[in-house]
Regions:
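Divalent cation-coordinating acidic motifs and surrounding scaffolds
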Residues: 1-152
């Protein structure tokens, strides 16, 4: 049913290296937030097999004139479990690309990083560049169980 607030959405094209594809979807209140721009992160030649991300980030810049942070960027990622550490580390390159393109530092990296269990080991975390970047704040502690199942 229709609510009292207007909503809009922005959806990516189907993304993925194989016949299996996924899309990123942003749903937002159009009376509060507007889209200023979007792009797909260029992570290399997909058909050549030397791209970084299984599903490259669909980066969206928003305007929110009534909030303290009036412009911000959302960067979604659903990493491939078998390459989670490499894809999470490559978010550093996406982060710097957003800063270089739009000159903005209010960036939220979000999604299913597959960063728990055996996908990203404790020995891999120190080499993930965003973990040591002082400009980044990790909002979910490593100890949080973010799975929907009863076990990890």
């Amino acid at each position: 049913s229709a609510g009292e607030h207007p909503y809009s959405f922005l959806v990516s094209v189907p993304l993925g290296r194989t016949s299996y594809k996924e899309q990123y979807l942003f749903v937002y209140r159009s009376d509060m937030v507007s889209v200023l721009g979007s792009y797909y992160y260029d992570d290399g030649c997909e058909s050549c097999g030397n791209d970084t991300f299984s599903r490259e980030p669909f980066i969206v810049k928003f305007s929110s004139p009534t909030t303290q942070v009036q412009e911000f960027v959302l960067v979604p990622l659903h990493s491939e479990p078998s390459h989670a550490a490499q894809e999470i580390d490559a978010l550093y390159d996406v982060y710097t690309d957003v800063i270089n393109k739009w000159g903005i530092k209010d960036i939220i990296l979000l999604g299913d990083f597959n960063a728990d269990c055996s996908y990203v080991t404790s020995s891999q975390w120190p080499s993930i560049r965003l973990r040591s970047l002082s400009a980044c704040q990790w909002l979910i502690p490593d100890s949080a169980d973010t799975t929907v199942a009863d076990t990890d």
